[in-house]
Amino acid sequence: VSSGYGIAMVGTLLAFRGRGKGIAICLAAFVFVLLWWLTLKPSNDRDWQPDVAQTAWAEIDGDHVTIHNVRNCDYRTEGDYTPRWETRSFDLSQIRGMDIFFTYWGSPWIAHPVVSFQFGDHDYIAMSIETRKEVGEVYSAVRGFFRYYELIYTVSDERDVVRLRTNYRKGEESYLFHTLATPEHARATFLNYLKKINRIRNRPEWYNALTNNCTTNIAALAGEPQWDWRVLLNGRADQMLYERGDLATGNLPFAQFKEQAHINAAARAAGDDPDFSRRIREGRAGF
């Protein structure tokens, strides 16, 4: 869209030497492109990459929840994997709390958060809000502003969504924090996730890097009342949560707290152990 508009402007300025006339035609071209852009509709019916080929959906019956299309891929490398989609059931009366992962891949200002809910002693289900890419697509921060990617809520086993980032993707560093959310707050947030998951399965949405992304959605679903610039520059969102008193810190200063939250080595040591979730939490503040 932006490149097409740029070409149109250059062509217009070359073709029309009259300044007023050129500006008017540029504005007309801009309005035309904008109106066309606003007609673009998101869809669930595209040639999706295998790891986002299915959309999760949930059935809720009192305290009993069944989630379909839980992703639990068998990875050999980042790009070589066997997709697996499972159905899992949860008892809402057993929800204990929620944790949050932050993964960095370059800039300290940008991260990808994943929220994980704990049921019972060692049962976790992770929620990752992402771009839903078609076959052949790669992520572009610029395209993320322009109705290019659909939004997807990936519901996953931690051995999938976490281990993919710690064990298989190159140059990614992940950190794990336990929140102080009560079981009641965790339950309400979990149900908000499920309602949104069911809604976008029937009414798909565009991802937007500014207004409809991984972090803005988490803040809305968790009922965060305060706006903070670190919701957008989310590489600093862990410090925001620390300062608000939302994390179990063990009374550590932030730098030390974050250092001990780094889980890559523990995740690699755990591999595909069924006890993966316990092992990456063991010995860390708040767990």
Which residue ranges define each predicted feature?
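Activation targets extended, charge/polar-rich intrinsically disordered C-terminal tails
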Residues: 1-9, 194-287
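Transmembrane alpha-helices and immediately adjacent membrane-cytoplasm interface residues
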Residues: 8-44
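Short, glycine/acidic-rich beta->alpha junctions
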Residues: 50, 107-109, 218
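Alpha-helical transmembrane signal-anchor/signal-peptide segments
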Residues: 42-61
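Glycine-rich catalytic cores of cysteine/serine-nucleophile enzymes that process amide/ester linkages
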Residues: 65, 70, 76-173
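Short amphipathic alpha-helical segments with coiled-coil-like heptad repeat character
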Residues: 58, 70-78, 223-227
